[in-house]
């Protein structure tokens, strides 16, 4: 059983017109960094006719916070005409919603085999699981290098860059961070898209490390097109294989939407 339980909204942080974070308080079961949950509201929050049976509108969202943090943080993109995301965007401090008691998913460090360099690629809100993992500081000393890469459309969408910089300092040289923007040029970020920046080797040259099957593991999270294209490139160009629970590989993936 995995029942819905109540969550109380402590804060809604609206980063842009389309990006926001919910800070929640809820008595959920312990979860692992990198896992996701489900949030829901009843359809009665919208003006439906009385003859329509009311049900929960639910969506899956990843945690940004470390499991040891008592406040839950969820990073969300507001979808045009999206039923739930627009309702969540308009919540206020003190409002309530539903959250699943138990969390889901295997996008966790326990599923990652030992390696020298762990690459974490994210687009958009896919940065969330990595923030959770890196803030927890567990099962992470076995990696010599951790590379965190966040790709967005515009520079102002790098909403968790201050946290990334704090983590960079706290890891004392183990963690490297890089940002990418695809729809404008900014001297603080690489310009382009992840698959192309791997194909032309610009990204690896900037980092100073090369992805290879002998000492690297790659985590991909976010836009399904990025995940697919990056996976296919690594599979073909670097002879890397998908990581499975029954058979360890070199690439661990999680699609958003």
Swiss-Prot record:
GO CC annotations, alphabetized: cytoplasm
Keyword Magnesium: no
GO molecular function: ferredoxin-NADP+ reductase activity; nucleotide binding
Binding site for FAD: 59-62, 75, 83-85, 125, 256-257
Matches recorded under SUPFAM superfamilies: Ferredoxin reductase-like, C-terminal NADP-linked domain, Riboflavin synthase domain-like
Enzyme class: oxidoreductase
UniProt KW keywords: Cytoplasm, FAD, Flavoprotein, NADP, Nucleotide-binding, Oxidoreductase
Domain of life, per lineage: Bacteria
Subcellular location(s) of the protein: Cytoplasm
E.C. number: 1.18.1.2, 1.19.1.1
GO biological process: cellular response to oxidative stress; heme catabolic process
InterPro entries in the cross-refs: Cbr1-like_FAD-bd_dom, FAD-bd_FR_type, FNR_bac, FNR_nucleotide-bd, FNR_type-1, OxRdtase_FAD/NAD-bd, Riboflavin_synthase-like_b-brl
Chain sites annotated for binding NADP(+): 152-153, 182-183, 193, 223-225, 229
Reactions this protein catalyses: 2 reduced [2Fe-2S]-[ferredoxin] + NADP(+) + H(+) = 2 oxidized [2Fe-2S]-[ferredoxin] + NADPH; reduced [flavodoxin] + NADP(+) = oxidized [flavodoxin] + NADPH + 2 H(+)
Family from the record: Belongs to the ferredoxin--NADP reductase type 1 family.
Name the record gives this protein: Flavodoxin/ferredoxin--NADP reductase
């Amino acid at each position: 059983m995995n029942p819905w339980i109540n969550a109380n909204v402590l804060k809604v942080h609206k980063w842009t017109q389309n990006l926001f974070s919910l800070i929640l308080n809820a008595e959920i079961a312990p979860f692992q960094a990198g896992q996701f949950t489900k949030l829901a509201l009843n359809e009665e929050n919208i003006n439906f006719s009385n003859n329509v049976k009311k049900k929960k509108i639910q969506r899956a969202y990843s945690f940004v916070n470390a499991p040891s943090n008592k406040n839950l943080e969820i990073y969300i993109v507001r979808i045009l005409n999206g039923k739930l995301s627009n309702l969540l965007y308009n919540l206020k401090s003190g409002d309530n919603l539903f959250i699943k008691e138990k969390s889901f998913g295997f996008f966790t460090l326990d599923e990652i085999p030992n390696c020298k360099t762990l690459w974490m690629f994210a687009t958009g809100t896919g940065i969330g699981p990595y923030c959770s993992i890196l803030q927890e500081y567990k099962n992470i000393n076995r990696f010599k290098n951790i590379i965190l890469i966040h790709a967005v459309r515009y520079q102002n969408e790098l909403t968790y860059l201050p946290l990334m910089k704090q983590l960079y300092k706290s890891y004392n040289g183990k963690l490297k961070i890089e940002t990418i923007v695809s729809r404008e040029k900014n001297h603080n970020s690489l310009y382009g898209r992840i698959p192309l920046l791997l194909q032309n080797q610009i990204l690896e040259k900037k980092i100073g490390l090369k992805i290879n099957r002998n000492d690297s593991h790659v985590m991909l999270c976010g836009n399904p097109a990025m995940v697919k294209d990056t996976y296919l490139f690594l599979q073909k160009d670097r002879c890397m294989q998908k990581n499975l629970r029954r058979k360890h590989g070199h690439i661990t993936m999680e699609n958003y939407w």
